[in-house]
Amino acid sequence: DRDKEVDFAVKIAELEPDIVVDLINFHLSDTEKMVAALKGTKLSHYLFCSSIWAHGRAESLSANPNSITKKPLDDYGINKFKSEMYLKARYRENGFPATIIMPGQISGPGWIIINPWGNTNVKVFEKIARGEKIFLPNLGMETLHHVHGYDVAQMFFKAITHREAALGESFHAVAEESLTLYGYARIMYEFFNKEPQIGFLDWDKWCEYEGNKEET
């Protein structure tokens, strides 16, 4: 466990890995420790799991995974972006063999899919299935980009397989198209054979309507 093991990075390095796939790294300090620990080992490839959340407030779509001007909005995204930049710098300066994979909103077995409210509250699906009216925040133009967990795994596998082309690069792991909250909601009404009943509320009123501060 990375949080419980003070020497987590050192213990990984002691295994003399050829490839490290780092899925549980959420802080720049942990990235720095891992790079330092793996220096001088037989490592041939380090794959870092970032997130499209590192993009933050996008100015254009589709976003460029290799952008150096991302504007993350919270600590999670900020730390992912800082780790991306750190790994890119280590690759350029020292040849550290890093690749960055940026998954979207992951779905599939073991995952509760992100819903048209942008959270994991299944209540919205129940409302839609009953043909009830739902409300979306603002104008429902916020964007989600889903991906199946299996496809995320394939991105890591393909990056390992095509190592030379992947080194020093960032890649999105997302579906072919993104969805607005509004478009997603309409698709769900159609899936349940119900007439779309979609309204809109400003952010504060929508938060009251949704009712769970932790999810908003």
Where are these regions (language model features)?
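Conserved beta-loop-beta element that borders a ligand/cofactor-binding pocket
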Residues: 85-115
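A conserved pocket-lining segment of Rossmann-fold NAD(P)-dependent short-chain dehydrogenase/reductase
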Residues: 124-147
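Conserved loop-to-helix N-cap of the C-terminal "lid" that shapes the substrate pocket in Rossmann-like
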Residues: 100, 140, 145-153, 170, ...
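Mid/C-terminal beta-alpha module of Rossmann-like enzyme folds, strongest
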Residues: 155-215
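NAD(P)-cofactor binding segment of oxidoreductase domains
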Residues: 13-62, 67, 78-90
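N-terminal Rossmann/SDR dinucleotide-binding element
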Residues: 1-19
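Short-chain dehydrogenase/reductase
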Residues: 61-85, 105, 114-122, 145-146, ...
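Structural signature of the Rossmann-like NAD(P)-dependent dehydrogenase/reductase core
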Residues: 46-48, 99-105, 145, 172
